[in-house]
Swiss-Prot record:
CDD domains: SfsA-like_bacterial (cd22359). It comes from Salmonella arizonae (strain ATCC BAA-731 / CDC346-86 / RSK2980). InterPro entries: SfsA, SfsA_C, SfsA_N. It comes from the Bacteria. Disulfide bonds: none annotated. Keywords: DNA-binding. Residues 201-220 bind DNA. This is Sugar fermentation stimulation protein A. GO terms for molecular function: DNA binding. Binds to DNA non-specifically. Could be a regulatory factor involved in maltose metabolism. Belongs to the SfsA family.
Length: 234
């Protein structure tokens, strides 16, 4: 997926109030960007890092510029806009880049399901096959080459795993897909040191038939593409 129009470059001064970030552009202009990430963003928002941002054509937006990528001072790319995890996953499914999810001719988004009244990110359907429910999670927390999710305790994520176990018990396919949006990560694990309950639920879910996938995106300031399976260590 190409960034169109091209992203613009700036230097990060600070992220604050979760949804805002101050930057300095190449010509020295000070801007405040919208930060579309509610997580801790550990390692993704170090002052002095390069920020790549987009600009909305909507003139009514209070903050028309959106922080899309971080390029660290060591050259690592991280996608901080969590909306891209679903966009890249959808594109990869439609282009048959995820072999585990190939062979379906109908793709639906934000379908209501489950005992806890959730919405699944994607549902795949095809004749003579069980429906496939897919929950997507964005992975940006890294320690060396290890990627972790979540980066903070996530009751919502725990709920999604319970819902997926219900889907599997009903005879459908249930999938949690971890979209790795950090160029230095080469393997994935649940973040036991942050949310032990989520890690325990993920292991339980896998034992009860939920499929656990992890795919990494190729990242640059011009394009992103989810295309590489990475090892999972539960």
């Amino acid at each position: 997926m190409l960034f169109s129009p091209p992203l613009q470059r700036a230097t990060l001064i600070q992220r604050y109030k979760r949804f805002l970030a101050d930057v300095i552009t190449l010509d020295g202009t000070a801007l405040t960007l919208h930060c579309p990430n509610t997580g801790a963003m550990t390692g993704c928002a170090t002052p002095g890092d390069t920020v790549w941002y987009s600009t909305s054509e909507n003139t009514k937006r209070k903050y028309p510029h959106t922080w899309e990528l971080t390029e660290t001072q060591s050259g690592v790319f991280i996608c901080v806009n969590t909306l891209w995890a679903n966009r890249l996953t959808k594109e990869a499914i439609q282009e048959d880049r995820l072999p585990e999810l190939a062979g379906y001719n109908i793709l639906k988004s934000e379908v209501k399901y489950g005992a806890e009244r959730s919405r699944i990110d994607f549902m795949l359907q095809a004749d003579f096959r069980p429906d496939c429910y897919i929950e997507v999670k964005s992975v940006t927390l890294a320690e060396k080459e290890n990627g972790y999710f979540p980066d903070a305790i996530t009751e919502r994520g725990q709920k999604h795993l319970r819902e997926l176990m219900g889907v599997a018990a009903a005879g459908h396919r249930a999938v949690v897909l971890f979209a790795v949006l950090h160029s230095a990560i080469t393997r994935f694990s649940p973040a036991r040191h942050i949310d032990i309950k989520y890690a325990q639920l993920l292991s339980e879910a896998q034992n009860k038939g939920v499929e656990v996938l992890a795919y990494k995106a190729e990242l640059s300031a011009t394009k992103m593409e989810l295309n590489k399976s990475v090892p999972i260590m539960l």
